[in-house]
Amino acid sequence: MWRLKVAEGDKNSPYMFTTNNFVGRQIWEFDPKAGSPEELAEVEEARQKFYKNRHNVKPAGDLLWRLQFLREKNFKQRIPQVKVKDGDAITYETATTAMKRAAHYFSAIQASDGHWPAENAGPMYFLPPFVFCLYITGHLNTVFTVEHRREILRYLYNHQHEDGGWGVHVEAPSSMFGTVFSYLCMRLLGLGPNDGENNACARARKWIRDHGGVTYIPSWGKNWLSILGIFEWSGTNPMPPEFWILPSFVPLHPSKMWCYCRLVYMPVSYLYGKRFVGPITPLIQQLREELHTQPYNEINWRKVRHLCSKEDLYYPHPFVQELLWDTLYLASEPLLTRWPLNKLIRQKALKETMKFIHYEDHNSRYITIGCVEKPLCMLACWVEDPNGIAFKKHLNRIADYIWLGEDGMKVQTFGSQTWDTALGLQALMACNIADEVESVLGKGHDYLKKAQIRDNPVGDYKGNFRHFSKGAWTFSDQDHGWQVSDCTAEGLKCVLQLSLMPPEIVGEKMEPERLYDAVNFLLSLQDEKTGGLAVWERAGASLLLEWLNPVEFLEDLIVEHTYVECTASAIEAFMLFKKLYPHHRKKEIENFIVKAVHYIEDEQTADGSWYGNWGICFIYGTCFALGGLQVAGKTYNNCLAIRRAVDFLLNAQSDDGGWGESYKSCPNKIYTPLEGKRSTVVHTALAVLSLISAGQADRDPTPIHRGVKLLINSQLENGDFPQQEIMGVFMRNCMLHYAEYRNIFPLRALAEYRKRVPLPN
């Protein structure tokens, strides 16, 4: 039986190290002796329920670890369930009951180190590169055991569409990228060309060939297929490693790039520069025949470089970008790959590129910045030295990415531990039931204190294009090491709120110097021109560089941008901080808030909403924006932006009293309700929180009551809420499953409703 283990790692291994005793780490291990018949039956029931409903609800309920934790804690929901009948008013007692049921359930699924585990996955291209890398390096069978393979295949079967393909994420229609990667994953894991549940392989192969064959895969796919030997590097657009030795005044210098873009193309350029190709095994030769629609040796590789299937094409390459690729392909690459330039320049560039890779690996404890980068960096280390220490350290951190749900085994971004914990603790504190959850608050507080980044990246971090990180919080755990602005803002807000509570309940408050470090980090990321806050590093590079975005299915990934959600979270954190610590950088904080408020007002869309960059979509963005405006002193009466936002929310309310938004809002950039105007508990909770922030209860609380009625009536018997549509997004067009949102936001909405909306006894 599979079990989730928390805050564990081999401290004696020379190939694994940690900055804080592995606090926040979450890994899955299989124990063949574990599990009673009842436990095993419970897990199997969850799997079967997902399978039967897989075409209706695509994201998993993330139930396996929840079942484990609830069993380990002997949790039983002892508060009777409540429902609100049509025509009945919601009483204070009813709201309190529903809130406490949600709070007790949420408290029971806290991990031993104080964080809340959760799936943070959804894209179908996260997992396969791990399989590709391990296949090439010869470690596939040792890292992915028979039990791993069974669960990986379960995941692929569960998310295969009826047309035989897979999307770029679990809710997206079939695409070449998702289908080819999933097909290769099945074949490399040992399935034959006609094997798999419900003819999975044959159906997938038919989809690929019916849509033109593998030459139509997007550029990221072309890179991996070239590495595997199913494509030729001459069929890809150049990614020269000389990029990393350019002088800093060059417009597209790496220091001007968004960190994730930088760290994807760093190892890609190394592998491209070496023209590395894995072993051409009989299976690889067979895959060449299966995936191409013409004989492999007859393909004109030069002509396929710019091909991309219409199913994958979200961001077409502008003419100026294709001109750049063609110039590099026809002019510079022939020179750089021949003597003497291959010795004078290319070899130097390859060495410098690997130095950057090693620097990033070391500063993330070989977790790397994310799951797309991890297998690329790991493979680059193996290519440099198959028996080297760097590659061995990479192998030990693969487990940090593996996640298991009732839908099978997947790879996640790297984890949302700190983000979920900060939001979850704030929801619990809003309940005003500290006496019932004091140990939960204390453990969560302890986790946040241990998760804060204590130092900057080692060595010359500026020379490695890094921003300072001391005082920040990451999205996941401290070992990951990458600072994030909204995680820092929510973490800071959380520890400040906890500092107002008795230390005998929640533990000693954080030292002021560490709070100052967090403030310094947040102040450093405000854009001087717009007043908006970036996420990882300073924004400010020319947005014209986005014309060079090579990724056909994502947008806005070349340079760092500013974001409404991050800006709003920082306003909330600073408003509380300056109240408690009025003398630290007072003038700078006040100026920050003024500029940030103007930025949020300027970013409002024509319909009164705000675009959500990290959640779906306009309802999510509007909730954060209104929270920031409200704490800064803006009200319905003195702020036109708030009045317009309220109109948007009231117009978007569904007939059932709730709210529900389609993920299609994100790529289309237009508010799109769910089909049939269905509601979700997360969107409903976000809208309720927004209306409460905007003072709707003082004017007409009816829309709020209707939304809360839906939340209360949706609550499950054990205090959980149902899993519905996917709720996260990144780079406009790729969705991400935040499994904990269905607990955090309804709990917070019920707590704020009970506290701020007058209710009858």
Swiss-Prot record:
Gene3D superfamilies: 1.50.10.20. The keyword Repeat applies. Pfam families: SQHop_cyclase_C (PF13243), SQHop_cyclase_N (PF13249). Its EC number is 5.4.99.56. PROSITE patterns: TERPENE_SYNTHASES (PS01074). It is an enzyme of class 5 (isomerase). Pathway: Secondary metabolite biosynthesis; terpenoid biosynthesis. Transmembrane segments: none annotated. GO terms for molecular function: beta-amyrin synthase activity. GO terms for cellular component: lipid droplet. It comes from the Eukaryota. Oxidosqualene cyclase involved in the biosynthesis of limonoids triterpene natural products such as limonin, a compound with insecticidal activity responsible for the bitter taste in citrus. Converts 2,3-oxidosqualene (2,3-epoxysqualene) into tirucalladienol, generating rings and asymmetric centers in a single transformation. This is Tirucalladienol synthase OSC1. It comes from Citrus sinensis (Sweet orange). The gene is OSC1.
